[in-house]
Amino acid sequence: MTELSPKYNPAEVEAGRYQKWLDADVFKPSGDQKAKPYSIVIPPPNVTGKLHLGHAWDTTLQDIIIRQKRMQGFDTLWLPGMDHAGIATQAKVEERLREQGISRYDLGRDKFLDKVWEWKDEYATTIKEQWGKMGLSVDYSRERFTLDEGLSKAVRKVFVDLYKKGWIYRGEFIINWDPAARTALSDIEVIHKDVEGAFYHMNYMLEDGSRALQVATTRPETMFGDVAVAVNPEDPRYKDLIGKNVILPIVNKLIPIVGDEHADPEFGTGVVKITPAHDPNDFEVGQRHNLPQVNVMNDDGTMNELAGDFAGMDRFEARQATVAKLEELGALVNIEKRVHSVGHSERSGAVVEPRLSTQWFVKMDELAKQAMDNQETDDRVDFYPPRFNDTFLQWMENVHDWVISRQLWWGHQIPAWYNAEGEIYVGEEAPEGDDWTQDEDVLDTWFSSALWPFSTMGWPDTDVEDFKRYFPTSTLVTGYDIIFFWVSRMIFQSLEFTGRQPFQNVLIHGLIRDEEGRKMSKSLGNGIDPMDVIEKYGADSLRWFLSNGSAPGQDVRFSYEKMDASWNFINKIWNISRYILMNNEGLTLEDAESNVAKVAASEAGNVTDQWILHNLNETIAKVTENFDKFEFGVAGHILYNFIWEEFANWYVELTKEVLYSDNEAEKVITRSVLLYTLDKILRLLHPIMPFVTEEIYAQYAQGSIVTVDYPVVRPAFENEAAHKGVESLKDLIRAVRNARAEVNVAPSKPITILVKTADSELEDFFNSNINYIKCFTNPEKLEISSAIAAPELAMTSIITGAEIYLPLADLLNVEEELARLDKELAKWQKELDMVGKKLGNERFVANAKPEVVQKEKDKQADYQAKYDATQERIAEMKKIKS
């Protein structure tokens, strides 16, 4: 047995430990076929850069789960991997190339992809280093990447199978277009932000010049693609105009007036311009009325030749030029400034352009129905907290067909080929012959990520051992911001292709926010690098903070004050451990367990030993129960209270009465209970703080704590009588301590303590444990009896079953206390005078902010209460003196 360092130093404790775990292969599945499997697939981080604090939280929760299950005897697999993150990674690499004055087009597809693979290798290494710093117990022998050949095979099969069922199709529809990345986006890749904008009101003159129809738009540059104006067929103002024409300003061409319910008589003028190639609602109107589709923009957001004199302009430049021209022509009615919601690309930040484009889509109605129906079966996915099941169902009910093609080079190239005759071939392998050209687009990143739980296990080969044993997975841990992005897609793809749900449980956590509750972002400059936190506090402190502040579905506020508290807690554990191990005298864990069994059987030890074992039992039960519900924050509070309050502040202090005595037999029992309880504490803590628990465990036991048994409740430790008795003992000691503090009597000063109880069992208990009471209260005189009469002047405390009297004359030097109270009274009078003067100033009351005035009134009330209380104490002291 070695000795722990005098001071807890996380850098020393954590250095080299992770590699030792890897070398010992303790993170791999046990291979025990009799053990129940428990598997988690890591939500694959994007290879776009370093991991942030949100990743640290997400992976910490997973590691807590998998470490506990491993200790509980499950055959655990935590499968790591990373996501190629198509648009995000390509954007990062293009940005790096731009700094060198190079574009991807300069390099060509193959050489550009070589650069992206270099980027991937660089950041995959960084991410794995971060995982190691966090202590994540993943099985690297099964590491996956979404562009691995095995996963690519799964992607191709899913695409082809869905295509053959008619659930993947190619067509020309309005999609979200990112002009910066020059690619299509799905609805959920669009972030809507409120921005300062305007409604531009314009007049479209009837063909006969008799009147004008007023329309409004936020995007006047799209008017070159207008092919109609619509009115509601039931709107009496315009019914007679349906079928006539208006003149499109600037372009001077005739476009028809159509009747369509899309036009709302209650909104604006009730007339809307119809631009089918640039608005999803207008596209639907165009389909109903067989209107042409006129696309007036290039893929980079500039205007094309159909915009006439505005061709080549950026869309926002064209907007201003168009408005100026309308004003010049007298067609601009007015500009109405307004804040409105505008879609932005999640990745590039560019304003998204609704645009007619030929893309590949997944038909969602049947897939969504399967997912919703499954939630009514025993094979459903359980969400924690349950309210997110409703969120999931709502999204599924309102889902649209999913645009899956992306105009990128980095990703899974769509397995579709075209020939000169216009034929399309879709297959897992390329068609024979040289006259076929593969579709240049790639699939949406989420298409491959949706297959992650089963493709990583070997699917489509369903006979491989990992797929048979570890799929469906047990639990998914992820943030609420990607329930639709990812969780829902994994569910419907898994149900479609494996017939099973991808995971049994989904633990949803919130976001990491700063101390002010703001979301961390680059723009605010409030992001926190978890590696910086680890360097200062250690991984265990960060993990404890992330776990202890965690409740399913809730956000967490990061603060350095909380990190200080985390470090202090671990330092407390370190110091307790040092005390126990320094007093251990060579006792082995096996000997301790044997002696503790005697305590449980009341064959050895004392009531405090029985009390701590009873409370340890309760702690194990409550922590395990809350872990099973993923209530890690609740479990953390239970552990904290037991370790700091019950074990350190009470039991460890109580043991000093024995350890400093000459009774060797009692010392052995006390050391045994200390070591046994410490061992169970370390095992309970290990899933949360693996490094420090391994370091301490190694001082008294062989092997690694990673694979030891997790604590279980032992019925023999249940002892309500011991629990009730020691809790009463603690209440008595606390009451005396509080009374001393109230009248500023030092703990070192002996005092008279009178305990009156009519409960004979309690009286016997207190008297039989009187040494503990004396040790903690320092009495000059201590009486415990049912016959005690209450002194006339005494501080009185009432606890369950007893009254405690501390005679005031014994507690105080009356003359000194009166002098002190006189000074205190003068102090409160001075404060009252000052605040009274301020509140008596009419100008202050009239001109100061209401909250400032109220603050002064609150001060006045507080000072008055303190003044009155001090006067009462003076009266009491004078009564004692007389």
From Swiss-Prot:
Pfam family membership, one: Anticodon_1
Oligomer status and interactors: Monomer.
Coiled coil regions in record: 808-882
Protein name according to UniProt: Valine--tRNA ligase
Location in the cell: Cytoplasm
Function: Catalyzes the attachment of valine to tRNA(Val). As ValRS can inadvertently accommodate and process structurally similar amino acids such as threonine, to avoid such errors, it has a 'posttransfer' editing activity that hydrolyzes mischarged Thr-tRNA(Val) in a tRNA-dependent manner.
The family this protein is said to belong to: Belongs to the class-I aminoacyl-tRNA synthetase family. ValS type 1 subfamily.
Keyword Coiled coil: yes
GO cellular component, one term: cytosol
MF terms (GO), sorted A to Z: aminoacyl-tRNA deacylase activity; ATP binding; valine-tRNA ligase activity
Domain writeup: ValRS has two distinct active sites: one for aminoacylation and one for editing. The misactivated threonine is translocated from the active site to the editing site.
Residues binding ATP, per UniProt: K522
